[in-house]
C-alpha cells in the first residue's frame, strides 16, 4: 500500500490559508464587470468604423441590392450552352470591361459545361454594364440570364414580431 500523508499533521503551515486573501478576492470581484455573450457589447463607434471599411452600393428603398465579394463584383450567368468555352464567355463579357476571373463548372460524367458561369469584374460599373447589356442576349444560340452573384438580403430592422406561421392543430388523443 502507498503511504498516506496527512496534510494537517505534517507541514500544516505550508498549506495555511491567508486571512487577508479572502478580503482581497472580494475586492477584486467587486471591481470586475460581469459580461455575457459574444463581443461583450462593443460600442457603436466600433461597429460603424468596421462597416466603413467595406465597399458597398447605396441601397434604394427596401429592395435587396448587389454586394461586393472579397475579390470583386461577381455576375452569375445561367443558361450557358454546354459546349461554350472560357474564350466564348470572355469574348462576350470582355466588351464591358476588364474581366478579373471566369469560373466554369464542368460535369464530370459528360465533360460539358453545367450551364452556368461566374464572371468577375473589378469595378461595379463594369459589372453593371455587362449585366444590363447581356441579360437576355444570345450566347451560342441560347439566351443567357445575368444576375449578381452576391446580394444583400432585406433590411434586418423591419421584422415583424410574433409567429410567422400558423400553428398546427392539436393532435387528438383517443
From Swiss-Prot:
Family the UniProt entry places it in? Belongs to the RBM8A family.
Segments of skewed composition (Basic residues): 28-38, 155-174
Instruction: Supply one GO CC term from the record.
Output: U2-type catalytic step 1 spliceosome
User: Locate the RRM domain: which residues?
Assistant: 73-151
A GO molecular function held by the record = mRNA binding
User: So where does this one cross the membrane?
Assistant: none
According to its UniProt entry, the protein's GO biological process terms are:
mRNA splicing, via spliceosome; mRNA transport; nuclear-transcribed mRNA catabolic process, nonsense-mediated decay; regulation of alternative mRNA splicing, via spliceosome; regulation of translation; RNA splicing
Q: Which InterPro entries match?
A: Nucleotide-bd_a/b_plait_sf, RBD_domain_sf, RNA-bd_8, RRM_dom, RRM_RBM8
In this chain, composition skew of type Basic and acidic residues spans: 1-11, 44-54
Protein location: Nucleus; Nucleus speckle; Cytoplasm
SMART domains listed in its UniProt record: RRM (SM00360)
* The UniProt record lists the keyword Nucleus: yes
**The protein's role, per its UniProt record:** Required for pre-mRNA splicing as component of the spliceosome. Core component of the splicing-dependent multiprotein exon junction complex (EJC) deposited at splice junctions on mRNAs. The EJC is a dynamic structure consisting of core proteins and several peripheral nuclear and cytoplasmic associated factors that join the complex only transiently either during EJC assembly or during subsequent mRNA metabolism.
Which organism does this sequence originate in?
Xenopus laevis
Please give the subunit comment from the record.
Part of the mRNA splicing-dependent exon junction complex (EJC) complex; the core complex contains casc3, eif4a3, magoh, and rbm8a. Identified in the spliceosome C complex. Associates with polysomes.
Gene behind this chain? rbm8a-b
Does the keyword field hold Cytoplasm?
yes
Q: Which Pfam families match?
A: RRM_1 (PF00076)
Q: Which UniProt keywords apply?
A: Cytoplasm, mRNA processing, mRNA splicing, mRNA transport, Nonsense-mediated mRNA decay, Nucleus, RNA-binding, Spliceosome, Translation regulation, Transport
Tell me what this protein is called: RNA-binding protein 8A-B
Which stretches of sequence are listed as region Disordered?
Answer: 1-70, 149-174
Amino acid at each position: 500500500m502507498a503511504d498516506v500523508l496527512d496534510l494537517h499533521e505534517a507541514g500544516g503551515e505550508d498549506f495555511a490559508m491567508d486571512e487577508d486573501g479572502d478580503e482581497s478576492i472580494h475586492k477584486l470581484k467587486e471591481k470586475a464587470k460581469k459580461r455575457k455573450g459574444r463581443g461583450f457589447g462593443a460600442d457603436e463607434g466600433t461597429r460603424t468604423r468596421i462597416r466603413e471599411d467595406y465597399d458597398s452600393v447605396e441601397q434604394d428603398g427596401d429592395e435587396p441590392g448587389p454586394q461586393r465579394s472579397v475579390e470583386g463584383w461577381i455576375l452569375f450567368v445561367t443558361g450557358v450552352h454546354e459546349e461554350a468555352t472560357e474564350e466564348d464567355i470572355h469574348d462576350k463579357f470582355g466588351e464591358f470591361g476588364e474581366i478579373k476571373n471566369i469560373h466554369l463548372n464542368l460535369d464530370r460524367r459528360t465533360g460539358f459545361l453545367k450551364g452556368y458561369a461566374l464572371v468577375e469584374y473589378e469595378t461595379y460599373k463594369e459589372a453593371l454594364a455587362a449585366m444590363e447589356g447581356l441579360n437576355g442576349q444570345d450566347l451560342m444560340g441560347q439566351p443567357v440570364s445575368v444576375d449578381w452573384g452576391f446580394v444583400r438580403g432585406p433590411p434586418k430592422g423591419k421584422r415583424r414580431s410574433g409567429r410567422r406561421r400558423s400553428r398546427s392543430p392539436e393532435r387528438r388523443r383517443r
